[in-house]
């Protein structure tokens, strides 16, 4: 049920029609939204009255509240139907709302210069009359993480910066100025490497990395284990991240109730080499039955990620892999453009590295490990997250 009297920042009322419309708009494949998968379990959004709606699910979902969420999930916030209804499907990309959104929060957009700055002013229609506390907020973009850190910790021209992907040596030097404070919170975001189980070099109906294909060497469990043993997590954290990160072998490091005690990989190149030899991958570059272990390893353009790539490449090269590095602008890599070959979802490489956002209740994140036709998975994972009816306690 929506709050009584809730209105958009342009003064229009927020209604159940907006919720139903959001489901229809986001779920349309032609719109190319990144939030579409979050609604895959929604069968219908039923309007009860102007402020009440029911979400009908096709299967039990303990994280149902994440559907209309944002920031802590892959869901989407409720959208204003009166501004978006003329921009369904392929028209979604051209909606004026994309550059001039309205919402129900304490601020509204006063100015947006893409790639540069967003200026916010107080939303006079905000539901709490005595908030917010700042008359305006300037959200500055562009530049890079080190520049953002200097603006807070050195020059003091900026009040606050978030998610600083800054190398340890640079951050330590800036902190010595005493102009700012570093606050580190365990948010559950994990920088991780993903192996492509499909073949990025074989086209199926004009597309690569199709589930119906099999990767020539990453389909071998021994190869994947060797690569994992060749990941020097401690060195990456000590040299690059410092106090802003902890090494982990879990996709979900927090909260404790979701942390697996059974996942562990030490850095052991000797064991990795032994696994490869035993599996028949020999030589330099390593090969087996005419297949060479040549690898394209992609990530975004970020000082930390590029240096982490170099550390990983060094060990993998020493193990006998032929590793080529590729870096992609983050606006391209994380794009929702279905026709873009360089997005993380298209996965036109053998290996890629990026971070999942943390979630307080990460059930929806675990859906990435659910089987799809042609996928590779553990049957137990599919059983627990799939549509089969299971007792709630077992789930």
Q: What is the meaning of each model-derived region?
A:
Residues 90-98, 253-254, 271-272:
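Contiguous mixed-secondary-structure segments that line small-molecule binding/active-site clefts
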Residues 37-87, 111:
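Surface-exposed binding/hinge segments that line
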Residues 1-34, 44-46, 106-240, 256-395:
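Extracytoplasmic/periplasmic ligand-capture domains
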Residues 12, 34, 64-76, 104, ...:
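A structural "hinge/loop" feature
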